[in-house]
Amino acid sequence: MFSIVYTTTGNKEEARRIASRLVEQKLAACVNMHPIDSIYEWEGRIEQDTEIALSIKTTSSKVETVTGCIKEMHSYDLPAIISWEIKGEKQYLEWIAGSTRP
């Protein structure tokens, strides 16, 4: 099984630091980074921020470890970390499996 883990960061440097560690440690095959505008409620106030969204491609068995790594490195008090299982083109999924194998 394969998954995408999604999170956001406050800036590109933090996004690159998290993405690099995940790929270097073979926890993710690929991390896409996207600039986004976010509107959300935090501590009773409506906030608007520019953030970087990360789409992290990994195996489902590594989601918990990926989540722990993100939480360890993240600057937010409560980072958004969500995941969902995916289907895809067979060869691409095989590449994800191979790229995350120690």
What do the predicted segments below correspond to?
Residues 1-102:
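Positively charged, small/polar-rich N-terminal and surface patches that mediate targeting and assembly
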